[in-house]
């Protein structure tokens, strides 16, 4: 019997109907590799192996051993490459699509890593519902929604109740999808002077992420007040106010009311 480790945020999805819904929600992958974070009890992994070759990152050595035993007992049409490694250090050389039931405590960081990685072309993940809603809202309500929609499109697919897991978490989960868009990536990469596209895209993402942290540091305060506290951006406050005037927005706007953060950042970086 496998006991979930609280230290790793383990809640294993066991409900067959939701496992099937996740697999069926995958978009066409060819020619992308499919990468999974977390093997869990192997239920999702085994279903994926009925349709696709798969590479899975798993930090828990006990779960890796259980998965190897299951694969010896169950022959699957496609092969699994099981990597016993922390997914925070995931690095792929070829384009891939990411799928995972992400641990709650580290889900946001793993999604942001995937968004920043030029090799990741999209993702289908399950997180705490509150986190999924932050990523998928269509306006600028928070920094996560701005980041994800600057590089692609995020869609909330369905909710998963606590009863679908073992052990059951205290909150609902949600499955959402992100598909990256090359034109948006090109615009983000153009923020930097880095000559190579993939490096420029990563640098552009990091620059925007850093800027948004300053803008949303105190969401209830005005954008101006937040930037006054930022060592990196306080000297650019006058340019921010100029931009707001050009966009016919009041200087008292909150961060959630800014219409186009990429355009604003481009304006600030001009000189």
Curated annotation (Swiss-Prot):
GO terms for cellular component: cytosol. Gene3D superfamilies: Ribosomal RNA adenine dimethylase-like, domain 2, Vaccinia Virus protein VP39. GO terms for molecular function: 16S rRNA (adenine(1518)-N(6)/adenine(1519)-N(6))-dimethyltransferase activity; RNA binding. CDD domains: AdoMet_MTases. Keywords: Cytoplasm, Methyltransferase, RNA-binding, rRNA processing, S-adenosyl-L-methionine, Transferase. The keyword RNA-binding applies. This is Ribosomal RNA small subunit methyltransferase A. It comes from Helicobacter pylori (strain P12). The lineage of its organism: Bacteria, Pseudomonadati, Campylobacterota, Epsilonproteobacteria, Campylobacterales.
